[in-house]
């Protein structure tokens, strides 16, 4: 095979292609279209995600080029076969002695070289935009090469190969072009999420964004996917060469070798694709086994871990932990086989109690200890384990498709100076895929991955919204990481062996993060507020010019705003924001506030706030339409919109720190009872305003479904806002018997009397009855079972004066078979302010209600969760 002939044919083919109008149309689209789109979307974009990371510019360039390149290759691949058949544009070569292999290789190399040159031109323009107009975005030239070789080049080879093969088989030009375009459109829109992107040559479902902390997520799986399409593309190109009928070279030895190579490459591609798909299927099978094992031991009485001292070491992606635990049987009966949970990828080296080896069985993440524990008995354990974290254990309640979904959840599009954050969905970037990471460069371990022994699984598979914790006295010693920043809960101390963390009180969860972090800390009143970020990611303080004292005053003021919004001071003396790699995805469990990004004393933010909105001081000055406002005003807006407002967003909501991270109230009889009780405590702090469609949806959901049934419905999980409305309704019914304000004080006192404990609801119910002489247990029994909503008729709303006192009044009739409730704000003479009044409207009854009201003419009646629309009536 003569290389000079191949180069000559390739040169001639490029000249022919450049003469076509379609080529220049594609060239304009590639050069000006992609550049224009990137300029519009990324230069001075209000969407922070477009310019936050070093990978977004090269990735967007590769993404759009892949799309246009595929269209170009389809047209060119079909056309050059058609030209040879009909137009005779290559008669110069067709009449010569070049073999079919030389001739086709020349034409193919000509097309591919032209596409590669166009790709380099597109990359060059993107680099110019990156360097000249996006100076704040880190420039990493190797990322452009990475996307060239892993994203655009394999797609070029595959699409060109399948286009040639189709053109050789289908002799009609228009039919071949039509079928290829239908296949392109169909695969483009239908295949990204089918079988985890196995049939998507553009790899849009794979997490291809680069993290400065850990690089690419699942790089091995990514390379398998790209090799599969590259090998299949090479094989199809070789097969297309064999189908050329220009010369009879069937006896050529190289032709036979080419046939073997074609078959071999296609088989290699299929094998790589099968390995890629099998990776996901194997994870799914393991998750099924983990679910079966957990449900098998779900109903067993459990022990509690009251203390856990750990010595942590790691080497590469393997960790080694020596754990000293104290188990206590606080149940009302003996436990034959105490159950603990540990990541299934971690093997137990030894398990002893007071130097006596204990026998145990393991089923996935379930550790069954063969040692009977009597009621009230304590059992000290020493457990040594090591291995590699298996991330398949995380979020067992999720269906496989959702677990493997790598798309970047909900992205706030922009944030105005007041902190309002309209939201949209970003479909271009896929960043997820990781739930834990252990490595020499970076380590992050959250409780979800069971990196330490626990008596409670991460999720209750029967009722995913049900939260249960053991408040444990954790002591953590990390050895061999003196050169890194080690982050965990508690007070840090350095010693000869390494870094240790201890806590002043028991914690419900423990996290560990090790990496190259920079840190800024400020002490405000008694709170130590810290920010940990990766080197070069100090965009938090960009443009801030306040002195430390002024910053402390500003922070104190906004923490006071936070306290007023929650009605309570922050119940921790340390709060840190920790930057984590962009490859990690937060999940909001059914009916819960705060994701796995919210841990005791720690709130994890994604790398450079990539998935969120961010406003720099410069951006806020533009929005305020001024060159420079008062420093405190502008920087206060930045602090509120970029940090503090996020503490009330679902993913980063810190309400668990005020609620179950302080005291967990649990009950097997009343699932999620702790959430309902804390709903009472914080009911006066915020209101959720639903649209008409949301109200209709809420009514349709609850009319015919009980709270207990909704919590246990795994096929149709209840949304958080719907669950919140149901809890508010039940709390309103309870408030008809006990003043809401008195219940607020009672719950706060109860939490203070049982700090950092797991408390049985029976204790709460007993103290509640002692305080108010109300059997809340019997009330909840009925309210948990109610599966209908009342219908209320309200009439004769009016304001009148009685002895100079303004009164609001109305008449209410409840014709339904279930009790209803009305809320009317009235004036409290003792408190000298408005307060809510709750009135029970029993089934099949009517009432006339009068309340003292000094907010003339704003007399309003709220009907709670019922079949009425509107659910609030004004006078």
Short names for language-model regions:
Residues 199-207, 219, 224, 252-320, ...:
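N-terminal, polar/Ser/Thr-rich
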């Amino acid at each position: 095979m003569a290389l000079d002939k191949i180069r000559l044919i390739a040169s001639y083919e490029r000249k022919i292609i450049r003469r076509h109008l379609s080529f220049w149309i594609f060239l304009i689209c590639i050069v000006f279209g992609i550049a224009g789109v990137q300029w519009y979307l990324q230069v001075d974009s209000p969407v922070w995600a477009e310019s936050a990371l070093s990978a977004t510019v090269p990735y967007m360039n590769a993404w759009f080029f892949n799309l246009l390149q595929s269209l170009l290759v389809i047209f060119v691949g079909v056309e050059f076969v058609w030209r040879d058949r009909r137009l005779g544009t290559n008669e110069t070569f067709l009449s010569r002695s070049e073999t079919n292999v030389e001739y086709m290789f020349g034409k193919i190399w000509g097309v591919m070289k032209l596409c590669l040159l166009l790709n380099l031109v597109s990359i060059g323009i993107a680099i110019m935009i990156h360097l000249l107009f996006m100076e704040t975005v880190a420039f990493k030239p190797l990322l452009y090469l990475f996307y060239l070789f892993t994203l655009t080049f394999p797609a070029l080879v595959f699409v060109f190969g399948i286009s040639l093969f189709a053109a050789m088989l289908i002799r009609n030009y228009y039919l071949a072009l039509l079928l290829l375009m239908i296949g392109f459109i169909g695969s483009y829109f239908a295949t990204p999420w089918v079988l985890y992107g196995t049939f998507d040559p553009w790899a849009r479902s794979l997490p291809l964004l680069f993290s400065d902390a850990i690089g690419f997520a699942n790089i091995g799986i990514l390379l398998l996917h790209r090799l599969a399409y590259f090998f299949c593309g090479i094989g199809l190109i070789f097969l297309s060469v064999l189908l050329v009928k220009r010369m009879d070279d069937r006896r050529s030895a190289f032709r036979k070798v080419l046939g073997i190579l074609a078959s071999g490459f296609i088989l290699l591609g299929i094998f790589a694709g099968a390995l890629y798909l099998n990776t996901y299927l194997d994870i799914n099978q393991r998750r099924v086994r983990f679910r079966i094992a957990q449900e098998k031991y779900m109903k067993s009485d459990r022990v509690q871990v009251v203390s856990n001292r750990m010595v942590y070491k790691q080497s590469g992606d393997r960790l080694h932990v020596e754990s000293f635990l104290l188990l206590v049987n606080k149940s009302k009966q003996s436990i034959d086989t105490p159950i603990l949970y540990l990541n299934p990828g971690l093997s137990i080296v030894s398990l002893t109690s007071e130097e006596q080896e204990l026998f145990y069985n393991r089923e996935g993440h379930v550790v069954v200890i063969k040692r009977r524990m009597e009621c009230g008995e304590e059992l000290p354990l020493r457990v040594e384990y090591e291995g590699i974290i298996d991330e398949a254990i995380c979020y067992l309640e999720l269906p496989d498709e959702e677990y493997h979904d790598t798309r970047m959840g909900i992205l706030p599009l922009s944030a105005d100076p007041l902190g309002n954050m309209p939201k949209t969905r970003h479909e271009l970037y896929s960043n997820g895929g990781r739930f834990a990471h252990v490595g020499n460069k970076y380590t992050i371990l959250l409780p979800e991955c069971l990196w330490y022994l626990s008596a409670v699984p991460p999720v209750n598979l029967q009722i995913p919204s049900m939260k249960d914790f053991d408040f444990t006295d954790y002591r953590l010693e990390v050895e061999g990481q003196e050169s890194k920043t080690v982050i965990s809960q508690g007070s840090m101390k350095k010693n000869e062996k390494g870094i240790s963390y201890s806590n002043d009180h028991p914690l419900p969860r423990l996290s560990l993060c090790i990496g190259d972090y920079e840190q800024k800390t400020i002490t405000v009143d008694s709170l130590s507020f810290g920010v940990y970020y990766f080197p070069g990611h100090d965009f938090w303080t960009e443009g801030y010019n306040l002195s430390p004292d002024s910053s402390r005053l500003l922070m104190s003021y906004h923490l006071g705003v936070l306290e007023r919004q929650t009605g309570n001071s922050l119940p921790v003396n340390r709060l840190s924001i920790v930057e984590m790699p962009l490859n990690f995805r937060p999940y909001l469990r059914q009916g819960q506030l705060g994701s796995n990004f919210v841990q005791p004393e720690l709130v994890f933010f994604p790398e450079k706030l990539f998935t969120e909105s961010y406003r720099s001081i410069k951006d806020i000055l533009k929005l305020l339409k001024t060159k420079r406002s008062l420093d405190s005003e502008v920087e206060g807006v930045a602090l509120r919109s970029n940090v503090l407002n996020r503490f009330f967003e679902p993913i980063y909501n810190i309400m668990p720190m005020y609620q179950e991270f302080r005291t967990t109230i649990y009950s097997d009889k009343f699932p999620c009872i702790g959430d309902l009780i804390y709903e009472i405590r914080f009911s006066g702090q915020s209101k959720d305003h639903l649209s008409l469609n949301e109200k209709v949806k809420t009514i349709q959901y609850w009319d015919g479904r009980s709270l207990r049934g909704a919590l246990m419905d795994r096929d149709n999980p209840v949304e958080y806002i719907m669950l919140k409305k149901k809890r508010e309704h039940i709390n309103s019914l309870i408030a008809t018997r006990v003043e809401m304000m008195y219940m607020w004080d009672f719950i706060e006192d109860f939490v203070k009397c049982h700090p950092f404990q797991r408390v049985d609801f029976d204790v709460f119910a007993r103290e509640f009855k002692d305080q108010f002489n109300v059997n809340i247990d019997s009330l909840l029994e009925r309210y948990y079972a109610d599966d209908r909503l009342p219908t209320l008729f309200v009439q004769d709303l009016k304001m009148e004066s009685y002895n100079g006192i303004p009164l609001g009044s109305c008449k209410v009739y409840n014709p339904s078979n279930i009790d209803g409730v009305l809320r009317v704000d009235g004036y409290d003479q003792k408190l000298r302010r408005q307060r809510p009044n709750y009135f029970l409207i029993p089934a099949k009854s009517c009432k006339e209600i009068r309340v003292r009201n000094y907010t003339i003419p704003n007399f309003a009646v709220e009907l709670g969760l019922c079949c009425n629309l509107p659910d609030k009536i004004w006078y």
